[in-house]
Amino acid sequence: MKEYLTNERIRAKQVRVVGPDGKQLGIMDTREALRLAQEMDLDLVLVGPNADPPVARIMDYSKWRYEQQMAEKEARKKAKRTEVKSIKFRVKIDEHDYQTKLGHIKRFLQEGHKVKVTIMFRGREVAHPELGERILNRVTEDLKDLAVVEMKPEMLGRDMNMLLAPVKVSA
């Protein structure tokens, strides 16, 4: 968090003073502004050091700083951490198993996670990548309302991978 110059540490000769209510009090000597702040039992805080003259505000600095820290903490808490979930299919997947895994993918997408869909090939199945593409295309078609394909199907060793991301909901 940024530190501000306060009270006696302000070195400018004159400052533009903003009162605790946000109203402009005008340009005055720093000593005069400091005396005014002390009369109100508040701090003089240099908030605009690069302005001409610098801008100082009369406020309760420790209270303001605490509120800023709490707001920062709350923002970090609300920042969504997206995870990449992984679902694996086999080439010869049964319809019920497919629907179950599709349900898992839907739930992950609704929670805002990305989903890596993997088709695992065994033995000679690797000679028929079109079977894996068919399953991935079906998944894409079944989830077209919930997801967008972030990474198209691609072979990696004995696996074919595709990455789905949740559709952004426009509010």
From Swiss-Prot:
- InterPro entries in the record, alphabetically? T_IF-3_C_sf (IPR036788), T_IF-3_N_sf (IPR036787), Translation_initiation_fac_3 (IPR001288), Translation_initiation_fac_3_C (IPR019815), Translation_initiation_fac_3_N (IPR019814)
Q: Which UniProt keywords apply?
A: Cytoplasm, Initiation factor, Protein biosynthesis
Q: Which organism is it from?
A: Thermus thermophilus (strain ATCC 27634 / DSM 579 / HB8)
Q: Which family does it belong to?
A: Belongs to the IF-3 family.
Main site of residence? cytoplasm
Subunit structure and binding partners:
Monomer. Binds to proteins S7, S11 and S18 of the small ribosomal subunit.
The protein's name: Translation initiation factor IF-3
Q: What functional role does this protein have?
A: IF-3 binds to the 30S ribosomal subunit and shifts the equilibrium between 70S ribosomes and their 50S and 30S subunits in favor of the free subunits, thus enhancing the availability of 30S subunits on which protein synthesis initiation begins.
Q: Which gene encodes it?
A: infC
Any one GO biological process: ribosome disassembly
* Compartments where located: Cytoplasm
Q: Which Pfam families match?
A: IF3_C, IF3_N
Tell me the GO molecular function terms.
ribosome binding; translation initiation factor activity
